[in-house]
Amino acid sequence: MPLRKKGAATTKAAATRKDSAKAPASSKRKDAPQHKPELVIITGLSGSGKGSVLKALEDLGFYSVDNLPVELIPKFAELTCNNPSIPAAALVVDIREGSGLKSFPKVFAKIRKSVTARLIFLEADNDAIVRRFSETRRPHPLGTGKSITRSIQSERTQLAPIRAMADLTINTSKFTVHELRDFIGERFRGRRDQSDIMIYVASFGYRNGVPPDSDLVFDVRFLPNPNYIPRFKNLTGRNPDVAGYIRSFPQTVEFINRISDLLVYLLPHYIREGKSYLTISFGCTGGQHRSVMIADEIKRNLSSAGYTAKVNHRDIVKAR
């Protein structure tokens, strides 16, 4: 039974974008960039979750760079413009930059002429930041000779001009790491759909062990075994006659339908969690008949539902 095609969530960023300057006409230039990539710059207070946001965007397909010097941002933007294989990128700029951070407003205004740039500013209440530094036992970047509270206040003051430029400001005080990743995922979900998770469907024989990279494992040894029918013994589940025999039993059809329904329910949730690939394994005794036929059916159904799926019959080469 083909799966019903279900679209993944496509919630896009709700933050209001500021007007950006229009790039000068350059259509006559032979070296004009062929595409205008998306660049998300993450900044904000130390301990506010910048690393978690960067990782969330990386899981959504963004090319990610942490702590890039401000003076290199224009060059990085130029490289993304000239590289169609990087449709979107994310980078972190923060107080570790030191005095170079003062030039960020001018640099950010400049790159907005060549890329679709967004600035995310993360902050948190003092109590939350103090607690996080206490849990990680790491010093505050501005903590030399200062209490952590004074360091936080100093950082707020230094970053105030950049905060005023932000397209999206997030207070992460009440977020767990998991919740923050979900929050970012919901706002950039337009970049992820069925095609953003690679599904590997595998068949195997239990006599050779369960594939160690399996995320989901289903035992199909309850289905009638074609191995006991002489004309099928040396064939595989890819043979039309063998596949037809296995499919002729009501429990086979019901199993395929129920697993298909389960997967169409699970996959959007895996995508929402940022999972990039999933291995679903089906096992029978030798990995020659039943698991092969079932894996092929499930792969076909997933493909018809719009997912990118590949099938691998691990033990079929061991067929007699």
Swiss-Prot record:
GO terms for molecular function: ATP binding; GTP binding. SUPFAM superfamilies: P-loop containing nucleoside triphosphate hydrolases. InterPro entries: P-loop_NTPase, RapZ-like, RapZ-like_N, RapZ_C. Residues 1-34 are annotated as: Disordered. GTP binds at D94, I95, R96, E97. ATP binds at G44, L45, S46, G47, S48, G49, K50, G51. Keywords: ATP-binding, GTP-binding, Nucleotide-binding. HAMAP family: RapZ_like. Belongs to the RapZ-like family. PANTHER family: RNASE ADAPTER PROTEIN RAPZ. Displays ATPase and GTPase activities. This is Nucleotide-binding protein Acid_7395. It comes from Solibacter usitatus (strain Ellin6076). The lineage of its organism: Bacteria, Pseudomonadati, Acidobacteriota, Terriglobia, Bryobacterales.
